[in-house]
A protein has these predicted regions:
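A structured beta-alpha segment of the ubiquitous adenosine-cofactor-binding alpha/beta core
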Residues: 1-46
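Active-site-adjacent "lid/gating" segments in soluble enzymes
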Residues: 35-115
Length: 115
């Protein structure tokens, strides 16, 4: 495996090279981050026209929350899951682990292979 520092130009250059020989890109940044780095779908499709790209931006690609990061605990709270797992209505506690993070990753990997 490799690690790329996408905040650096050389990391982004290497990422684009890898896209050229890849079938699928899966990422979980906010849309603003990928666009600013030139690594959003519109840019990467020019490198590899038949690219499959899966974006796990938890707050969506559009809408007022699109540039907010989504973490498992945040999504659990916003969805009402922390309320459902509370001992009492005034003390929500959540699941104790990031169920939403695992579910999102599993759904994304299953979804990209379905075409």
């Amino acid at each position: 495996s490799i690690t790329l520092d996408l905040s650096r130009p050389q990391g982004r250059r290497l990422a684009r090279k890898l896209v050229g020989i890849s079938d699928v890109v899966l990422e979980n940044f906010t849309p603003r981050v990928m666009f600013n780095w030139g690594l959003d779908y519109d840019h990467l499709q020019k490198v590899r026209p038949d690219l499959i790209m899966v974006s796990l931006c938890g707050m969506g690609q559009t809408g007022p929350w699109r540039n907010f990061a989504a973490f498992g605990a945040t999504i659990q709270a916003l969805s009402g899951l922390t309320y459902l797992t509370a001992y009492t209505p005034d003390q929500p506690i959540g699941l104790g682990y990031a169920h939403a993070d695992h579910a999102a990753g599993l759904s994304a990997t299953n979804g990209q292979g379905g075409g």
